[in-house]
């Protein structure tokens, strides 16, 4: 007999003991059938008592495909993380700020909730103060994060969990109307995934507000990224199972006041992101940035950069390429550059322009290449290439220029369509 079978048996007994019988007189477990020839559909309602944490983990362990697990209004404390590995389960609270799952007393360093199954919907609750990541899903295709809050209530601290919402290695990822505050890496992070939508969400006081990393096909739109270190990041890194991130559209977002000091633990890639970065594209391809409101980001509104470290991954291209920047609005910003860019500010009278490219065109001794960067903004919008050429930086060869690069048009990726997206 497997350990999981034993756990399910014990958990089922615990749930029945907590809920009593399963008749219609007991609202804790109701059974419904949408049609005679279909499997029974269950709705399990977790009672709001002092055993809430045990009841919830029991329900997650014993869930059947198609179950809905309902959480009541209230604040409930946990000492251990939760996990779900059953397909087609919906976990639904009474609403953001109404159903609050507090992990302030969590033992260990794990995530608050780990999902490793497909076709899962998470909606209508708040996660607070997890020791590790807020909600992580891995290999969870067709997952929906909707109407959720993940936050660390002590403000931006390096001891906070790294990621708020953290889907990885998945296809058809929908993040809709999610709020994240205080993540020490990224508020909303989607990594090594395909076919992604992140929309109508609020990210604030994180290191990175939204990060798309080593992923293919993402639409990031109608979000507000405010008071982070960096608003929206699109990165590609070496030595990961999926390398060659491409085809991201960043549009109709409000990306303002992202001037929080970088509080990422040393060694994290985001620890290098300058405070005051609006949008940053690092080593990614076919990224389209349009229709965004960018305001008061103190370093620069848009940064295009190459990966700086030495690498051995032969699949990897460390340069940002085929990037299109058009039809955005810009105001303020660039007046207090941070990090390595602070060294360049005196060259421009202390003020960096709206769009900054590091000017790296080769790596590890390779010949220079044309990166086809399309800067299609009005002439009044400032731009500079720092003229770095290649990392590590050689100050003697720097060649800054405000002349925009010649470029060919880049076809915009088609809008992302996710079949389980019911609201649009």
Region annotations inferred by a language model:
Residues 20-23:
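Bacterial signal peptide processing site
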């Amino acid at each position: 007999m497997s350990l999981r079978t034993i756990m399910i048996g014990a958990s089922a007994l615990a749930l029945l003991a907590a809920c009593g019988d399963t008749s219609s007189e007991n609202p804790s477990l109701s059974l419904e059938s949408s049609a005679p020839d279909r499997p029974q559909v269950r709705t399990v309602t977790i009672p709001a008592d002092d055993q809430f944490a045990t009841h919830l983990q029991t329900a997650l362990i014993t869930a059947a495909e198609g179950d809905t697990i309902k959480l009541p209004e209230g604040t409930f404390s946990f000492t251990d993380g939760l996990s779900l590995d059953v397909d087609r389960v919906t976990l639904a609270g009474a609403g953001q700020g109404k159903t609050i799952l507090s992990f302030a007393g969590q033992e260990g360093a794990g995530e608050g909730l780990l999902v490793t199954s497909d076709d899962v919907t998470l909606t209508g609750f708040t996660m607070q103060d997890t020791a590790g990541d807020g909600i992580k899903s891995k290999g969870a295709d067709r997952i929906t994060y909707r109407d959720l809050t993940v936050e660390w209530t002590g403000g931006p601290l390096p001891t906070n969990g790294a990621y708020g919402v953290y889907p990885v290695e998945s296809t058809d990822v929908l993040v809709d109307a999610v709020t994240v505050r205080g993540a020490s890496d990224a508020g909303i992070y989607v990594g090594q995934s395909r076919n992604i939508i992140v929309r109508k969400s609020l990210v604030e006081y994180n290191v990175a507000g939204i990060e798309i990393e080593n992923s293919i096909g993402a639409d990031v739109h109608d979000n507000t990224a405010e008071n982070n270190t960096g608003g929206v990041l699109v990165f590609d890194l070496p030595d990961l199972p999926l390398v060659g991130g491409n085809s991201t559209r960043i549009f109709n977002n409000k990306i303002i006041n992202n001037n929080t000091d970088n509080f990422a633990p040393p060694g994290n890639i985001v620890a290098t992101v300058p405070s005051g970065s609006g949008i940053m594209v690092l080593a990614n391809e076919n990224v389209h940035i349009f229709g965004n409101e960018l305001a008061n980001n103190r370093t620069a509104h848009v940064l295009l950069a190459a990966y700086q470290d030495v690498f051995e991954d032969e699949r990897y291209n460390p340069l940002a390429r085929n990037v299109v920047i058009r039809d955005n609005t810009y105001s303020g910003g660039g007046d207090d550059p941070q990090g390595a860019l602070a060294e360049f500010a005196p060259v421009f009278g202390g003020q960096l322009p709206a769009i900054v490219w590091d000017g790296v065109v080769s790596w590890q001794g390779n010949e220079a290449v044309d990166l086809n960067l399309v800067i299609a903004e009005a002439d009044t919008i400032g731009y500079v290439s720092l003229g770095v050429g290649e990392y590590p930086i050689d100050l003697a060869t720097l060649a800054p220029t405000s002349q925009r690069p010649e470029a060919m048009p880049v076809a915009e990726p088609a809008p992302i369509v996710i079949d389980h997206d019911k609201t649009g």
